[in-house]
Amino acid sequence: MAAFENFLNVGQSLYNELKNICVWVKSNGGGMGSLYRSRHEMVCVFKIGKAPHINNVKLGKNGRNRTNVWEYPGVRANTPDSLELLKLHPTSKPVALLYDALLDASNINDIVLDCFGGSGSTLIAATRCKRRARIIEISPHYCDIILWRWEKETGKKASFVKNIGENSNEQ
């Protein structure tokens, strides 16, 4: 729990407002652990800037009936798709979870930032819901995996640039 508190404190020092803490309940069981296997992960939803936050849920007005408890299968070795993701990265997140979160709190062509790119699930989700993603990943190996997944998803070839300008519509 101390790690989550540290994460929350850092988030609160960087962002303007904590909008909610969501709980991802892994509907297919727990992940790693020792005494008790954790079947959930905490997701902090922060807002930055002075503009009103984006709320595409609107209490179900548009058919998006959402709560702060999100039930999605965890990525485990018991399905072919999950096994492929686990081979790429040990803590891959389901694209469907990220896709729904992006639909909830962003609009088409908005920029989405993921500072821990990992296996690239955020980039895939952003591509599917027409958001522009900015992904940061420290490991060159995982950067290659992210690019490979994006190329597989889009059928396009990634190109390397030194600087992506503010007006760019590239992923």
Spans of model-derived segments:
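SAM-dependent methyltransferase catalytic region
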Residues: 151, 157-171
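Short linear sequence elements within intrinsically disordered, low-complexity coil regions
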Residues: 75-77, 147, 165
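Core catalytic lobe of class I
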Residues: 1-143
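Short, structured secondary-structure boundary patches
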Residues: 38-44, 153-160
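Short alpha-helix adjacent to the SAM-binding motif of class I
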Residues: 141-152, 156
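Short, intrinsically disordered/low-complexity patches at protein termini
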Residues: 42, 146, 167-168
